Each structure stands twice: as C-alpha cells, then as structure tokens.
C-alpha cells in the first residue's frame, strides 16, 4: 500500500462565514469523517476529530491558536480518535463513558479498522495493526437545548439519537445551518451497530425536518447539502 507523508494526511477546505472542512483524503470515502471547524469571535468549535492516525495539532497548528471546543457528534472511532489532543472536550452524557474509556468494541474500531479503510498510510505500513483510540474524558457534558456561545455566533445542541444513543447535531439558527453528525449524511445507511436504534433514528429525522434548514454539513460522504 502507498505511503504518504504526514503533512499530506489532511486536506482543508474553507467555506463561507468562518466554516472550514477538514478531512483525511487517504481514508476511503465510506469511512472518512468530515470534521467541521467553526470560527467565532471569542472561541472556535471543532466538530469531531477523525481517525487519530496523524496529529491534528501538529499538522494544523492554527486549530489551537484560539480557544477551541472539541465536540463529539458521537463516539465511533472515526469521529473521536483525535479528541485527546484538545483541552476542552464536549460530549453527550449517553456516550461520555465511551470517550473516557474507549476500546475496540465500544468505538467500533475492531470491526472496521483494516486495509479496506485506507487508500494509503501515513509513513507507517500496517500502522493500524496496533490502532487504538486514546481516552479523552469529556470536560463538559452537553445535551438538548444547551448553547455553545462563540462570541458572535451561537450553536444550539440537538440530541439526535439513532445512529448511536448520544448522537448530537449543532444548529445555527441565524444562518439556518445544521451540523448533523451521522444522523444525516450523503451515503448508505449504516444502522446495524450494537447501540443503533431505528425508532430513535426515525424520530430524530422527523424533528430535524421541522427546522428551516438551508445548509447541512454532514459527517460522511459529500460534505454539504442545500
């Protein structure tokens, strides 16, 4: 398998209004997490942190030049493996235990991490052979109705279980923008995880349909939909 240098592991795409997409282009699309950086006047938010194979802080030092809230949309390995790099870590109570004590089973890493996940490796062939998600206990628990105040913009927490019990989305009412986590994305439905619940999933989708959404920034597949 191809080897790529660590400084090529991430790609960043800057959108409008202080929103940036970070992703790992050498992770195959089905497994690739879209990480969203949202810039505010006083602090920033990073929604999810990817596979953890390469350090976000080392390769993208601008992420921590300002106060940063690292939010876990849920605690599957491909969304939280970089969370240990950040001082402020936010998660829903239903999955806080996984963030604090992750293993190959509760994060789904054992089921998915392998050759089929990658187009290339970051300077270490078979580096996933000893892959593990490092513990990153939540420093703040967030739930339905909580608000992340960035100074000049506000993100409201929506509890959207179904894909997992502690799944959350972030809603910016002022711009009608939804950061949907894995509850809405452009790709095949994957709802056979040990803690997925289709009834909860349907209920979450129904409540999201009531929002006046203009833009969805999803976590898998095509980054944004209008």
Give names to the regions the model predicted:
Residues 44-46, 51-52, 133, 137-140, ...:
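Metallo-beta-lactamase
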């Amino acid at each position: 398998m191809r080897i790529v240098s660590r400084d090529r592991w991430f790609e960043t795409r800057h959108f409008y209004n202080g929103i940036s997409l970070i992703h790992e282009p050498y992770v195959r699309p089905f497994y690739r997490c879209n990480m969203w950086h949202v810039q505010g006047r006083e602090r920033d938010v990073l929604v999810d942190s990817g596979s953890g194979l390469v350090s976000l802080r080392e390769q993208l030092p601008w992420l921590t030049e300002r106060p940063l809230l690292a939010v876990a949309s849920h605690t599957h390995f491909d969304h939280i493996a970089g969370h240990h790099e950040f001082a402020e870590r936010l998660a829903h109570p239903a999955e806080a235990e996984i963030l604090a004590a992750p293993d190959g089973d509760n994060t789904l890493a054992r089921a998915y991490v392998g050759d089929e996940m990658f187009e290339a490796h970051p300077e270490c062939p078979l580096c996933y052979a000893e892959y593990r998600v490092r513990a990153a206990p939540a420093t703040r628990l967030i739930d339905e109705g909580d608000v992340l105040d960035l100074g000049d913009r506000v993100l409201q927490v929506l509890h959207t279980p179904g894909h997992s019990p502690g799944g959350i989305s972030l809603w910016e009412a002022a711009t009608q923008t939804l950061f949907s986590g894995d509850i809405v994305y452009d790709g095949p439905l994957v709802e056979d995880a040990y803690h997925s619940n289709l009834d909860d999933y349907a209920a979450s989708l129904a409540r999201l349909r009531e929002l006046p959404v203009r833009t969805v920034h999803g976590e898998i597949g095509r980054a944004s939909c209008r």
